[in-house]
Amino acid sequence: MRTWSTEYNILDMRIIKVNACHSIAEQPLCERAQTATIGFFDGLHKGHRKLIGDVVQASLRNGTESMVVTLDRHPSVLFCPERQPRLITTAEERIGLLAETGVDNCAIVEFNSLTASLSARDFMRRILKTQLNVSTLVLGFDSRFGHNRTEGFEEYRAYGREMDVDVRQDVALTNDGDVISSSSIRTMVGEGNVERAASFLGRPFSIRGVVVGGFQQGRKMGFPTANIRVPDDVLLPASGVYAVWVEIAGCQEVFQGMMDIGMRPTFNRCSLSVEVHILDFNADIYGKDVKLSFVSRIRREKKFDSVSELVNQLSEDEVMTRQMLSEELAPKRAK
């Protein structure tokens, strides 16, 4: 009996859930040979898309199916939760973005203590070769896997020869001379440089959350805001005011928004606030899921001497927001 192995379809991509406890004596999860790559793929940025595109093209030449092998959670969750990076994309977003690449299969490996204990050779033999029927493995320029990630491409290629797996290495993709990576995107977003992050991602950086109740300070000033609750492990941009696109669950229209992230120093608050003033909008959306796509940072967070001074600044921020968003195309809603 297979342990923790199920499948379902997202668009035309088959999802295969895999556990390291799968017995070698069992039938493989994939009958056809696979041309695959492996990684966590947080953000699914331009570099990831190039790698996966190369895998898809190689699979066509090889006469195999194409596959992405990924983990169900970031490895640091198990070993160093205090050092876990804030994620660019949630697991659901990551799988949805993978489905858009045209890859045939996505194998999601349950990351647990057994998986983490496997050497690179054992991972290739037990999971990639035996369970997933991988015949060609295309690795990213910095790809590392196996216990403690101590081995590299030459070792992987040698193990591949033992198992009749052709192991190849892709080249890095750069942007203005800088290598595109998830860690560099996290740094950019953390500094508020959402424009540069978008150039690495190939789309605006975005977050999702649920609209919850707040202190109503914005409404009292003439700038009502929707307070957004986001998952704790999601990456947030640096404090400040941003021009954003707002998508609301159940609504096909995409709205312009002025987003504020910060501690609300003018009101002496001590907790982080994530709220958006949706322009030309006045409806009750409490409890609704929203997606916020960041276009540009308007200004840094600032403490004002009075509420009236803050209101004047918000009026200027709104003018700037409208101007910036008028020069950008709104994202297309999925039908």
Can you name each region flagged by the protein language model?
Residues 2-34:
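Positively charged, low-complexity intrinsically disordered leader regions
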Residues 14-16, 106-109, 166-170:
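General small-molecule cofactor/ligand-binding pocket signal
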Residues 25-90:
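N-terminal catalytic cores of NTP/NDP-binding nucleotidyl/phosphoryl-transfer enzymes
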Residues 86-94, 118-124:
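Glycine-rich, highly charged phosphate/nucleotide-binding loops
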Residues 98-99:
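ATP-dependent adenylation/nucleotidyltransferase module used to activate substrates
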Residues 114-224, 301, 305-311:
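Classical nucleotidyltransferase
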Residues 214-335:
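Phosphate/ribose-recognition catalytic cores of enzymes acting on nucleotide-derived substrates
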